[in-house]
Structures are given as structure tokens and as C-alpha cells.
């Protein structure tokens, strides 16, 4: 065991997910790219060399399909990326998504019971660019409601979830929590921050 640690400013891990069929295979979204391990974390190798990978989604039915949200103010090649070979190669998604000029975070979630249904939220630092949905695994996208889920913290704190039994129930969180009961057509703000 080596107890000689060094600290590097502004380097962090944003997200860690695992393959639901192989718990030895994990993926880490970091400030320095996306990393993969096939031996439970003993060794890691970079699989997406982009600055500020902030969110990862592994398809629960087809774990060879992954999505990675890349970007913040300083990212060059920001956008939503998809891999169809366990993270070995990546392509930038664009069919129906806006130009990647945002300076905030991209988050992504998928339907645990329908591999084709994916939702992404693209944000600026203090506001939402858009909420988008794909019903064909990311081949094309269409815009959902224009709720400002990312207000005040679009570069940092956000979460997204499609309910595992009722895919019409979607939760999106930032400073406030938003809920849709019709598959994302309308989101209603459920909380009010008063700090």
C-alpha cells in the first residue's frame, strides 16, 4: 500500500457506472476523459479522450451501448457521444440535437426496459439549452418541454431518471425538481428553493 498521495487541482471523477451483466467492467467519467476497467478497477485505460466527461449511461438491456455527456466552458469537442462496442469507439450524436455551443453539463438517462428510449438534457452554465428524447437508441432526437431544469447550476448539479415501471414518469433535477407524467411532453416544477 502506497500512502504517498498527491493532489491535483481541478481533476475529478464525475460518474462511475458498471456493466449490469459484468460487474468487473466499469466506466468512469472524469475531467480527463472516459476510462474503462475490465478487472473491477485494478487497471484503467482511457477510452474517450475528451475534456470534462461528466455523465455516462450504460444501456441496461444492451450494455454494449453507452452514452457520454461531454462538456463545460473549456471543452473543445463537447457534445453527446455514443458507443456501440462497450466504450471502445465513440461517435458524436447530432441528428436533432442543437449545435454544441453550450457551456454547461450534458446529462443522459435511458429507459431500463426499452433500450431505444434515451433522454438527454443539455445546459448552459445557468440555464437549460434543451431537453431531448430519442426513441431509436440515439439515431435521431426531438425536443421535449422547455422547462429550465438547469437554472443556476447547469454546469454542475443535475440528475435525470426514467421510472423503471412507468416510462411516462420522468424526473429531472437541478436546483429544483421537475416531474413529467406524460413522457416528457410537459415538465412541472415540484420544488422551490428559498435559500
Residue map of PLM features:
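Extracellular glycan-interacting surfaces
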Residues: 1-195
